[in-house]
Amino acid sequence: MRNIIILACTECKQKNYTTTKNKRTMQGRFEIKKYCRFCRSHKLHRETK
């Protein structure tokens, strides 16, 4: 089962992206480097609660 998650920038805490995640195969918090339009650069985005 895939769940919808929200990705937030670790620098400015803005919620920029949504994606899906399979909870069976991916344990823990999802992290990926993506572009943050508020910081105007590529930053680490982490799954929020």
Swiss-Prot record:
PROSITE patterns: RIBOSOMAL_L33
One Pfam family recorded for the sequence: Ribosomal_L33
Protein's UniProt keywords contain Ribonucleoprotein: yes
Gene3D superfamilies: Ribosomal protein L33 (2.20.28.120)
UniProt-recorded Gene Ontology molecular function terms: structural constituent of ribosome
Keywords, ordered alphabetically: Ribonucleoprotein, Ribosomal protein
GO BP of this protein: translation
Key word 4Fe-4S present: no
Disulfide links within the chain: none
Top-level division of the source organism's lineage: Bacteria
InterPro entries listed in its UniProt record: Ribosomal_bL33, Ribosomal_bL33_CS, Ribosomal_bL33_sf, Ribosomal_zn-bd
One GO location term (cellular component): cytoplasm
Stored HAMAP family: Ribosomal_bL33
Family: Belongs to the bacterial ribosomal protein bL33 family.
Name the record gives this protein: Large ribosomal subunit protein bL33
Organism field: Syntrophus aciditrophicus (strain SB)
Source lineage: Bacteria, Pseudomonadati, Thermodesulfobacteriota, Syntrophia, Syntrophales
